[in-house]
Regions:
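Surface-exposed loop/turn segments and immediately adjacent short secondary-structure elements
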Residues: 200, 204-206, 229, 241-248, ...
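Active site of divalent-metal-dependent phosphoester/diester hydrolases
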Residues: 38-52, 133-140, 151-177, 239-243, ...
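Surface polyanion/phosphate-binding segment centered on an Asp-His-Pro turn
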Residues: 5, 80-89, 119, 177-274, ...
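Short, charged alpha-helical motifs in flexible N/C-terminal segments and linkers
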Residues: 1, 11, 276-383, 417-462, ...
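Short, conserved micro-motifs composed of acidic
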Residues: 31, 139, 159-179, 184-185, ...
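Short phosphate/oxyanion-binding micro-motifs
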Residues: 1, 5-120, 133-137, 141-152, ...
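Conserved pre-catalytic core of RNA-dependent polymerases
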Residues: 376, 410, 414-624, 661
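Active-site palm subdomain of RNA-directed nucleic acid polymerases
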Residues: 112-123, 512-530, 553-555, 631-660
Length: 932
């Protein structure tokens, strides 16, 4: 096999004992036929050094800037390898003596690896690092932290050094992509007490099989011509205005739109062989034809003049394609700069998708689609049935879930209001244009193109829907695309259903969402314990509140039990009858409830695999997947859950709920009883509402100081629905990786790993962007991710802040091209970037501004108290915020304390700014001045 030959050709032998005494061995003494030696000796000291034997038919270049032996004797030999016309790879042969500090990974190897990443190649690090990967000690943790943060994978799994008394795994191979690995392992030999490790590499990308898609062809689509053609049918569109039957209106609307669009952008089935190049214009195609013509002429004549002409055409084609690609990418990024998902689509279109496999099914696609649809449409019904069985198996006595729902006064009922054309236009223009279309294959791009023509009829149709309490039948059909999560793609449960709805239906949903959300906010109908789908609320604000509660408990020498509840298929199993009753109780008028009833019922879906569709099946449970209204409806469904809990606190972000309770260690026994009682109450409530609560995935985390946690009995556990739940060391909650000490070490480590992976992806295609676009892409996709919920964890250690700074430095080098040995500060200043420490301070300050000015949830705003609100004495500090008193440094890590301190230290001119936009601008100017 070619891949085996390649792998054998790339065999790399390394040895840490290639010199003896102070006189090193010569290359002739250690030569191997057909191999070239690349060596890195330890100078002026006996023993040591590494070398690599590279087969002579492989082009090998030592990266001298990266290769060195440090003062502490840490060895790094970096080599660029290229075999034939395959893309080159980089290997690093390394050795760490046992007496070299473990800091060498962070201080020496990591900077060089990050610099190697800028070369945009796959990397292998291999050698004897004297870190036993079979023993959970300090050495293993140090090496694991290193390769985890840099998205490397350690592929050797068995002992590499065996003695009479021990077995250790100290010789490792770290790879930047497991897709490269064909085979790896350890070779049994008696040459040395170190067993050789090996890896076979597959360097050629597999040829992707063709796939088919059915979509509209916009090759000859012209928005102006389409709109002009639509104007000729305005009489049919205007006839809509005299009709009040919303189903008839929609049929007419779709018929006019479809018949016109079918002419300008007909539905076609395409065979996709290669990635599309929309930027290759007809002019470039003609140049390519001329280039190929001159190449054929040279091949016939072998004339040097013909070769020169061919090269001119070839270079001209390359230049024009590169320029066209950059222009196309820039325009795409500029259009979707505020949508990170769209930006990733753009980047993934540029990067060849080597690891993505076209799904091939052993059964007929029609049969698979039918089986998948049967499974997906039964998920909600089965979850509700399982919830009922779970209650029966655990002797949970279920009662009527509607008996304790609070009913609000009838003089404050919600009624739909007619919407204006201006409001509909605003909603449509704010919607992204690149979302996948629904069953009708009409995307938002087309709706925007013809909006001046269809706006009146569309607005009338939405108003008819609201006034007649009717949701059109054609809008209740969804197309489902199965997306593989993991495992066998032919098993339906291994796939996630992506539900596609008609884009015009989402406009109507957005109108309803805006009106109903405003009503719920005005009359304060949503529980204060629900932070999802509410203005001024976010995952960050809820995380701040909960972590502050836990830090305050530690300050008071208490522990906190945090229980993260897991609801399986929560959106799918919602009972329509219960939800409609709760809508009525929360204030929706009978007419509004009737509209929601029509919206929820009578729905169906079909599954599409490639170009094959299943038959449609009815959906009897749940809120619609992929619908704009679904999160709000679910929040209303569980709105009274927090009120049922007795001794603990319960907070939610949509369907993510948590129980938590702070307690003294001496009250551990009673607290355990209280926790189990509230878990039972929560389980009973969920099961009564047909929500399947999963005890096996429920996480139990104890948070406290190290001394307090050491006093907790190791056998502590909770019993929940027949399952024993023991405390975990780490748990992920709303995107934050929590540990028992709230150190955020694990969170930062995973964050660094994720950001570095994204930067490597972007670095591979950075030549497709100009610097301005590249900066925008990195800020949107990497820096924004790095700062997610930063006000929660910005109180972490300086060591973690330094790790994040290294990510920002790498991002800066990707954009600016600054070399490893060049100082990074001027480049950061040129990009107008704050260092990470100042960046975190900026975000903390903005959150403090929001809390002081009522732009945050009440549960945060209420902690920002003016001293003048406490006493009437007129003092110099009368207008400052009251600083909360904490006994320990842990208490001072709370955002409550940090935010108040930050606010009090601000200049009065900055505090008095009334616009948050201007405040952010002025704050950034001040921090930039302080930084540089």
């Amino acid at each position: 096999m070619a891949s085996h030959y390649i792998a054998k050709s790339l065999t790399t032998i390394f040895n840490r004992s290639i010199s003896t005494g102070i006189f090193p061995l010569t290359n002739r003494e250690i030569a191997i036929d057909d191999y070239k030696i690349h060596r890195l000796d330890r100078l002026h000291k006996k023993g040591g050094g590494v070398c690599a034997y590279i087969k002579k038919n492989i082009k090998a270049t030592v990266l001298k800037d990266l290769s060195k032996v440090s003062v502490s004797n840490f060895h790094q030999l970096w080599i660029n390898l290229q075999w034939q016309k395959n893309k080159s790879i980089i290997i690093c042969v390394t050795y760490r003596p046992p007496d070299t500090s473990l800091n060498c990974f962070e201080d020496l190897l990591k900077p060089n690896y990050v610099q190697a990443l800028t070369l945009n190649k796959q990397i292998l690090v291999l050698g004897d690092l004297n870190c036993n990967m079979l023993e959970n000690g300090q050495e293993r943790r140090a090496l694991t932290n290193f390769f985890t943060e840099l998205n490397l994978t350690q592929i050797i799994k068995t002992p590499t050094r065996i003695t009479a008394t021990s077995q250790t795994l100290i010789d490792v191979i770290l790879v930047s992509s497991t897709a490269l690995v064909l085979e790896s392992g350890v070779i049994n030999t008696s040459i040395s007490d170190h067993l050789p490790v090996y890896v076979l590499l597959k360097l050629k990308a597999p040829k992707m099989p063709a796939c088919y898609i059915t979509t509209r062809s916009y090759k000859n689509y012209n928005p102006s011509l389409f709109s002009s053609d639509l104007v000729t049918k305005s009489d049919r569109l205007l006839s809509i205005l005299s009709n009040t039957n919303v189903n008839t209106i929609l049929e007419t609307f779709k018929d006019v739109l479809h018949s016109t669009l079918d002419v300008h952008a007909p539905l076609k089935t395409f065979k996709i062989r290669n990635r599309s190049c929309p930027y290759v214009t007809n002019e470039i195609k003609e140049l390519m034809k001329s280039r190929d013509l001159h190449l054929r002429r040279f091949q016939l004549t072998r004339d040097e003049g013909d070769w020169v002409v061919y090269k001119e055409y070839r270079n001209n084609v390359k230049t024009k394609i590169k320029a066209a690609a950059k222009d196309h990418t820039f325009n795409e990024v500029r259009e979707h700069k505020h949508n990170s998902r769209s930006l990733w689509k753009i980047i993934n279109n540029i990067i060849p998708s080597k690891e993505k496999e076209t799904q091939v099914y052993s059964k007929d696609p029609k049969t698979v689609a039918e089986d998948f649809n049967l499974f997906f449409t039964s998920v909600g019904r089965n979850a509700a049935a399982t919830a009922k069985s779970l209650a029966k198996d655990n002797n949970v006595a279920l009662s009527n879930p509607l008996s304790n729902v609070i009913t609000y006064p009838s003089d404050q009922l919600f009624n739909f209001q007619s919407v204006t054309c201006t409001e509909v236009q605003r909603i449509i223009m704010a919607m992204p244009s690149n979302k996948s279309p629904g069953p009708d294959k009409i995307g938002m791009r087309v709706i925007k193109d013809c909006l001046p023509i269809i706006l009146g009829p569309l607005t009338h149709m939405i108003n008819c829907s609201l006034m007649t309490s009717t949701f059109p039948d054609l809008w209740k059909i969804s197309e489902v695309i199965p997306l593989l999560k993991e495992g066998d793609h032919e098993i339906a449960s291994n796939n996630r259903p992506l539900s596609l709805l008609e884009v015009v239906s989402k406009v109507c949903e957005k109108v309803v969402l805006n009106q109903f959300s405003s009503y719920l906010k005005e009359f304060n109908r949503i529980s204060s314990h629900q932070s999802g789908n509410r203005s001024l609320h976010s995952t960050e604000t809820l995380n701040i509140f909960v972590t502050d509660t836990m830090l305050e408990a530690i300050d008071n020498k208490n522990l906190t039990a945090l229980i993260l509840l897991d609801l399986s298929k929560a959106f799918d199993s919602v009972s329509h009858s219960i939800l409609l009753h709760k809508l009525s109780c929360i204030g929706a008028s009978p007419e509004a409830v009737k509209w929601f009833q029509d919206y929820l019922t009578g729905r169906s879906q079909y599954v599409r695999i490639g170009s094959t569709k299943s038959s449609a099946r009815p959906i009897t449970h749940g809120v619609p997947q992929g619908a704009i209204l679904s999160p709000l409806l679910f929040c209303i469904y569980i709105n009274d859950l927090p009120g049922s809990i007795q001794s603990c606190n319960l907070d939610s972000y949509v369907d993510d709920s948590k129980l938590y309770k702070s307690f003294c260690i001496y009250d551990l026994e009673q607290t355990t009883i209280n926790l189990e009682a509230d878990l039972q109450i929560a389980a009973k409530w969920c099961l009564e509402h047909q929500l399947l609560i999963n005890p096996e995935k429920t996480k139990f985390l104890l948070v406290g100081s190290r001394p307090m946690l050491q006093n907790v009995p190791t056998e502590i556990s909770l019993t929940f629905l027949g399952k024993t739940i023991r405390p975990v060391l780490l748990a992920k909650d709303l995107g934050i990786n929590l540990d028992s000490y709230l150190s955020y070490d694990d969170h930062i480590s995973k964050l660094v790993s994720s950001c570095m992976r994204k930067l490597c992806q972007i670095n591979r295609v950075k030549d497709s962007f100009d610097n301005k676009t590249l900066k925008l892409v990195i800020e949107t996709l990497v820096i924004n991710k790095l700062l997610y919920c930063s006000t929660v964890w910005s109180n972490t250690s300086s060591n973690n802040i330094n790790k994040l700074q290294s990510v920002q430095n790498f991002a800066c080098r990707v954009i600016s091209g600054v070399g490893k040995f060049d100082h990074i500060t001027p480049a950061l200043r040129e990009l107008n970037w704050l260092p990470v420490e100042k960046l975190l301070l900026e975000r903390d300050t903005v959150m403090a501004y929001k809390c002081f000015n009522g732009l945050a949830p009440d549960y945060l705003v209420d902690n920002f108290i003016k001293r003048s609100d406490i006493h009437d004495r007129s003092t110099r500090n009368h207008d400052l915020l009251d600083i909360p008193l904490y006994k320990s440094a842990t208490g001072q890590r709370t955002f409550n304390y940090r935010g108040v301190k930050i606010w009090n230290d601000l200049d009065d001119k900055l505090k008095n700014i009334t616009s948050i936009t201007i405040f952010k601008k002025k704050l950034r100017e001040i921090l930039l001045k302080e930084s540089y």
